[in-house]
Amino acid sequence: MPYIAIKAYPKDEAVKRRVAERIKQVFLEEWGCSPQAISISMKEVNPDDWDRQVRYGEIEQDREHMLILDGEKKY
């Protein structure tokens, strides 16, 4: 715990690694967990597939758990 799953448009490996390290650091500082407890995955989604797979396939079905949606706070 925690497991952070990210879905995003394709990026190069260096960018994905930097983002994962920054997210890991935030969880270490804010969540207070050990480094061994953190798992982060990144799945690339083609822009043409985004709405079908992610927007309507996941986001719209899970709106009640969204903390930030379309760049706006939902808390």
Predicted regions: what they are:
Residues 2-75:
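A domain-level signal for the structural core that forms small-molecule/cofactor-binding pockets
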